[in-house]
Amino acid sequence: MIEQNVSVIIPSYNRAHLLWDILPSYFQDEVIEVIVINDCSQDNTSEVLKEIKKKYQKLIILENEKNRKQMFSKNRGLNIAKGEYIFFGDDDSYLQPGTIKRMLQTKSDTGADVVGARILYMNSDEQNFNECIERHNIDGRFISDLSRLEFSFTQALSEPVECFYAQPFILTEKQTIGDLRFDMRYTGNCYREETDFMLTLFLSGKKFVYDSQALLINFPPQKATGGARTANKFLY
């Protein structure tokens, strides 16, 4: 029997038109709950989430009374998560089948504290996921340079590799996170709002591993409208 011990946390803002395409991909066998935090969306996100819950009983819906941004929403999800493991997802990123199982196995095999997945971004002219994957098989890069705070995780590698950072899509034990939370002083879509969170884990001695076979596909920009992006990308 497969143990269901992973809590998925997904903030969402104005992505009602994507939720039926995206959320079902996260209900993988090892997942005990998918926590979606509706960040006071102005579209019909609330109604769509209620419809999805009729089919997927593991969906947990949290509603922010006002728009509080990604950091608050992720922290809110962390505070109620009941799984032994945490996985952070996104409301415009499709989780490939078997990814959660793969990340759990990689964590066990490598002794990693944090396992990061590969995220690929579809171009506007790409019609399906395979086109996106094939392009990155040619053009993908793997960079993990702490001295320059430079990283790229789009290359397909033959095996998991140790690194100092990961994409936002990580799997880790809840006890590894402990009392650490995303810093609420960041406003806007900073040098990625999760960068500080990741580096705090790394500098505390946690081992990061990147597994390119754990894969998410981000929908193209003309479809992935809405979301939490802001103009104040470097505001602190």
Functional labels for PLM-detected ranges:
Residues 164-170, 175-180, 187-214:
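A short, conserved alpha-helix in the catalytic core of glycosyltransferases
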Residues 135-162:
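Short, flexible, basic/aromatic active-site loop/helix in glycosyltransferases
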